[in-house]
């Protein structure tokens, strides 16, 4: 049987979400991943993948993303990384984070610069980071 969650005066008049017998979900509108905003990041930072899908981090010092324990296989999203007014903050990665060619991630260093890094969780303890998009203005 299908599960239909509707909006309106009668069930199903405007389907908002339906899940069929094969567990295929269909949304009647845009599904928006939650954004976690943290404006003071320095030192070791562990992302909470159960609390949010996307992360906005302002670096106030050098940051190491430590290995999380909350990631879900198949989860994807992005990191928005903002340098503070000083800039030149660096990013180091725990072993669960994997970057293209294993080279790590190089961010923009100018004060107040904004970079975007996509990610997808490939498997337990394996978070694939995409190539950063640098220096948004």
What are these regions (language model features)?
Residues 1-28, 135-136:
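Beta-strand-rich receptor-binding modules of extracellular spikes/adhesins
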Residues 2, 16, 24, 44, ...:
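Detector for repetitive beta-architecture
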Residues 26-51:
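Extracellular beta-solenoid/beta-roll
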Residues 3-4, 22, 40, 50, ...:
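Intrinsically disordered, low-complexity regions of eukaryotic proteins
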Residues 6-13, 58-137:
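Acidic, glycine/polar-enriched metal-coordinating patches/loops
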Residues 14-15, 27, 40-43, 61, ...:
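N-terminal compositionally biased, intrinsically disordered segments and leader/signal-like regions
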Residues 8, 23, 35, 42, ...:
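N-terminal cationic leader/targeting segments used for protein routing and processing
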